[in-house]
């Protein structure tokens, strides 16, 4: 039997999603909790591995088990055995051909910037703070140069293990909500640090150091050294993963918190 789960987590206290020796990971905590419910060792596969400090509201995983449990046992049981900063949002039985990573058709991230002169006290690890003025309209304009199928070498981490730097960017929207700026990005997949490197470059445009057209020149240059600095992990959320409707996965609000699904 194959089970799919929707996972939400605050990544602040973890060294990323992936299980690692001698450090805390979201995957390890989830697997330990599921193993208690299943009464056998459980290993999960995820839609996307997030880095240290990165959060998730829409992570999807799957695992196989030979025990019969009601779906509420996987949600309530796992949550009862996990730290309070990780939660299972839903559980469904899926066909054996479903794979959390390889069945996914798109991933969506949101990066939240608190744009204010003073740092926040609440949500300080859930947003990235930038004290200077940012022009979100110019940031949005710049982001439109990234749409479509492109080589994202200029926004790819030096140690990225992906075989190809090419990805299909489906949308990139930058909107302001009071003192908060939200960068909403969706693509078929992402190279390592792609969202944070794009964000760092958009910030340079937003503060007037570069014109929106500069983003186009970065794409063409295919040189990471020319782009902006990697933005901090704190403001980044994996909020949604798309799958073919045939798998019947639940649709839930993507957030984080009170943010609506559509910010336009």
From Swiss-Prot:
It catalyses: uridine(38/39/40) in tRNA = pseudouridine(38/39/40) in tRNA. Substrate binds at residue 109. It comes from the Bacteria. Keywords: Isomerase, tRNA processing. Its EC number is 5.4.99.12. The active site is at 51 (nucleophile). It holds the Pfam family PseudoU_synth_1. GO terms for biological process: tRNA pseudouridine synthesis. GO terms for molecular function: RNA binding; tRNA pseudouridine(38-40) synthase activity. InterPro entries: PsdUridine_synth_cat_dom_sf, PsdUridine_synth_TruA, PsdUridine_synth_TruA_a/b_dom, PsdUridine_synth_TruA_C, TruA/RsuA/RluB/E/F_N. Belongs to the tRNA pseudouridine synthase TruA family. Homodimer. Formation of pseudouridine at positions 38, 39 and 40 in the anticodon stem and loop of transfer RNAs. This is tRNA pseudouridine synthase A. The gene is truA.
């Amino acid at each position: 039997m194959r089970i799919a789960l929707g996972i939400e987590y605050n990544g602040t206290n973890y060294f990323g999603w992936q299980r690692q020796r001698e450090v805390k990971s979201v995957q390890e905590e989830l697997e330990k909790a599921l193993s208690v419910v299943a009464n056998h060792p459980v290993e999960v596969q995820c839609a996307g591995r997030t880095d240290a400090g990165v959060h998730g509201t829409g992570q999807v995983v799957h695992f196989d088990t030979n025990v019969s449990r009601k779906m509420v046992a996987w949600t309530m049981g796992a949550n009862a055995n996990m730290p309070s900063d990780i939660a299972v949002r839903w559980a469904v039985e899926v066909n054996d051909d479903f794979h959390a990573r390889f069945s996914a058709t798109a991933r969506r991230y949101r990066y939240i910037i608190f744009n204010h002169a003073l740092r926040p006290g609440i949500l300080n690890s859930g947003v990235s703070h930038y004290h200077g003025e940012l022009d979100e309209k110019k940031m949005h304009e710049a982001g439109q140069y990234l749409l479509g199928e492109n080589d994202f070498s200029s926004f790819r981490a030096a140690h990225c293990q992906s075989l190809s730097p090419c990805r299909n960017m489906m949308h990139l929207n930058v909107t302001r909500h009071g003192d908060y700026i939200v960068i909403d990005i969706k693509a078929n997949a992402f190279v390592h640090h792609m969202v944070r490197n794009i964000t760092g470059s958009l910030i340079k445009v937003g503060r007037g150091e570069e014109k929106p057209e500069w983003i186009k020149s970065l794409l063409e240059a295919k040189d990471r050294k020319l782009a902006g600095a990697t933005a901090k992990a704190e403001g980044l959320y994996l909020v949604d993963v798309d799958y073919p409707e045939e798998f019947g996965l639940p649709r839930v609000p993507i957030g984080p918190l009170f943010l609506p699904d559509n910010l336009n």
